[in-house]
């Protein structure tokens, strides 16, 4: 058993050391303007970190982020808005490209029901204003099952139908075992990349990228850094790799 886990760890480290080579499909993101759509400040780092860090360092691509609420469930909305700007700067994203929605119909909360039409309205406004070519958001499981995350997907699906010239990619949710095996998830993800699906993009964060993502979370979203967030930072596979699938 020790031999088995040691082999997995060594393989994972090898993948990390050649992260760029292990990633696949990034050319599909080679567009002038990309929009990340998520529900709460800190979603960008907790879930989309490898992708947003990769794109933020591609100087030919303008990266915008659209946060559909200010995360005011605990009364810290104004603080969290500012924290998002700080975190975005770690990915080389200018504050003018950070957009936070203030809509009474889109409030942070597990019990808050977001109408996909309202979500799509706000997404469409940013797409039109900034000539967005590609949109990246959650899939239909929302990684954690959070209803606000799932509403992002449902709103994006309306964009797929109404604006077919905009390509939409969704972040793949995985089972709870894979979610919390950190770098070891590079193994099943690497196997997945060998399948060569044309509608899939796989991005592995190298050591420097992973450190930037952690820095964005810890130094950016200070109000959210309770004890279990550190567990996420060091155990979640979403801090080290993302799998994006084309939505149709």
Swiss-Prot record:
It is a single-pass membrane protein. Its EC number is 3.5.1.89. It is found in: Endoplasmic reticulum membrane. Residues 25-248 are cytoplasmic. GO terms for biological process: GPI anchor biosynthetic process. InterPro entries: GlcNAc_PI_deacetylase-related, LmbE-like_dom_sf. The keyword Endoplasmic reticulum applies. It comes from the Eukaryota. GO terms for molecular function: N-acetylglucosaminylphosphatidylinositol deacetylase activity. It catalyses: a 6-(N-acetyl-alpha-D-glucosaminyl)-1-(1,2-diacyl-sn-glycero-3-phospho)-1D-myo-inositol + H2O = a 6-(alpha-D-glucosaminyl)-1-(1,2-diacyl-sn-glycero-3-phospho)-1D-myo-inositol + acetate. Pathway: Glycolipid biosynthesis; glycosylphosphatidylinositol-anchor biosynthesis. Pfam families: PIG-L. Keywords: Endoplasmic reticulum, GPI-anchor biosynthesis, Hydrolase, Membrane, Transmembrane, Transmembrane helix. The keyword Nuclease does not apply. The chain crosses the membrane at residues 8-24. Coiled coil: none annotated. Belongs to the PIGL family. Involved in the second step of GPI biosynthesis. De-N-acetylation of N-acetylglucosaminyl-phosphatidylinositol. This is Probable N-acetylglucosaminyl-phosphatidylinositol de-N-acetylase. The lineage of its organism: Eukaryota, Fungi, Dikarya, Ascomycota, Taphrinomycotina. The gene is gpi12.
């Amino acid at each position: 058993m020790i031999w088995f886990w040691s082999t997995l760890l060594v393989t994972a480290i090898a993948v990390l050391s050649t992260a760029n080579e292990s990633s696949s499909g990034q050319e599909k993101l080679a567009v002038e303007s990309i929009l990340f759509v998520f529900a709460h400040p800190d979603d960008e780092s907790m879930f989309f970190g490898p992708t947003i860090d990769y794109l933020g360092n591609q100087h030919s691509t303008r990266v915008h982020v659209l946060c559909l609420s200010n995360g005011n469930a605990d009364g810290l909305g104004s603080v969290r808005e500012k924290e998002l700007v700080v975190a975005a700067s770690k990915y080389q994203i200018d504050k003018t490209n950070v957009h936070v929605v203030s809509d009474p119909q889109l409030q942070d909360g597990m019990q808050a029901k977001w109408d996909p039409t309202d979500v799509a309205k706000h997404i469409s406004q940013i797409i039109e204003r900034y000539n967005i070519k590609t949109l990246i958001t959650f899939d239909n499981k929302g990684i954690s099952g959070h209803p606000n995350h799932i509403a992002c997907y449902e709103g994006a699906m309306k964009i797929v139908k109404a604006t077919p010239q905009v390509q939409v990619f969704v972040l793949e949710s995985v089972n709870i075992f894979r979610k919390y095996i950190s770098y070891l998830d590079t193994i099943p993800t690497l196997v997945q990349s060998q399948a060569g699906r044309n509608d899939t993009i796989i991005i592995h964060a190298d050591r420097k990228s992973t450190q930037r993502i952690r820095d964005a979370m810890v130094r950016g979203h200070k109000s959210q850094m309770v004890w279990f967030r550190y567990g996420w930072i060091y155990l979640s596979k979403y801090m080290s790799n993302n799998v994006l699938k084309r939505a149709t």
